[in-house]
């Protein structure tokens, strides 16, 4: 970068910087500001009586196969209530295909190739679409945190940046509100994979080519946004993760 030294760039998370390099030969085109991943949010208040009655533990939620199995048990135990939902279906496909050995999108020489592996797609189908069709999973509101607020789900996968929207109460159809405890778990992976994966997403900024004065001013602003004090303040208010390693 013409406006950032190597030492300055080394202070930023290297994987965030790599994401902003659109090809191996390119410079830094997208400057990282804030990043997020995904987590599993669990209504612990609703989980405890179910877990005690059915002999399940949070270890069973470590894999997608386990989530589907637990959801089936919850459906039977609760007389037909939904257990789980997730935001961002695309993340399930992209991360899942990568975990299972053949990423859906692969880059080669600066170009992206689209790959569909039938066996991998079938495994992802069996662990999401099938339990969804059976009523074990559901999506009713705009976001799954909305569905937890209404008691329609007791678990969901959503962005870590959405943690501030995680409900602390459940409201029933009659308007009665019940306080709940929510616990956050690692996002599930597929059973038996060699390496667990999680999505990396978030905000970055680009500087439009103009003249040196404007470009340098924009770089100064980006430098300010990623200083530890400012970056931590933004992270706390937004729920995103800071990009500077000293602020993480």
Model regions: which residues?
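Extracytoplasmic/periplasmic solute-binding protein
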Residues: 18-40, 48, 65-113, 120
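Short helices/loops that flank or line small-molecule/ion binding pockets
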Residues: 68-73, 131, 142-156, 171
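Paired acidic/hydrophobic, glycine-rich loop segments that form the ligand-binding mouth/hinge
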Residues: 154-159, 166
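Short, solvent-exposed loop/beta-turn-alpha elements that line the ligand-binding surface or hinge
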Residues: 2-12, 56-60, 102-123, 171-176, ...
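Extracytoplasmic/periplasmic substrate-recognition and gating elements
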Residues: 26, 126, 134, 173-245
């Amino acid at each position: 970068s013409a406006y950032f030294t190597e030492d300055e760039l080394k202070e930023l998370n290297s994987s965030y910087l790599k994401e902003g390099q659109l090809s191996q030969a390119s410079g830094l085109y997208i400057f990282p500001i804030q990043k997020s991943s995904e987590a599993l949010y669990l209504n612990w208040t609703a989980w405890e009586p179910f877990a005690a009655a059915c002999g399940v533990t949070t270890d069973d939620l470590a894999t997608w196969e386990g989530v589907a199995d637990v959801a089936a048990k919850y459906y039977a135990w609760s007389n037909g209530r939904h257990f789980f939902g997730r935001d961002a279906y695309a993340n399930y496909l992209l991360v899942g295909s990568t975990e299972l050995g053949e990423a859906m999108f692969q880059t080669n020489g600066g170009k992206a190739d689209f790959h569909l592996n039938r066996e991998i797609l079938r495994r992802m189908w069996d662990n999401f679409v099938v339990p969804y069709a059976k009523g074990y999973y559901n999506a009713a509101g705009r976001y799954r945190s909305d569905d937890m607020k209404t008691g329609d789900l007791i678990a969901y996968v959503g962005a870590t940046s959405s943690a501030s929207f995680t409900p602390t109460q459940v409201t029933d159809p009659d308007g009665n509100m019940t306080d709940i405890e929510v616990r956050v778990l690692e996002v599930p992976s597929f059973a038996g994979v060699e390496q667990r994966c999680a999505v990396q997403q978030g905000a970055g900024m680009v500087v439009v080519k103009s003249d040196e004065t404007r470009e340098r001013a924009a770089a100064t602003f980006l430098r300010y946004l990623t200083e530890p004090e400012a970056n931590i303040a933004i992270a706390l208010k937004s729920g995103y993760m800071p990009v500077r390693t000293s602020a993480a």
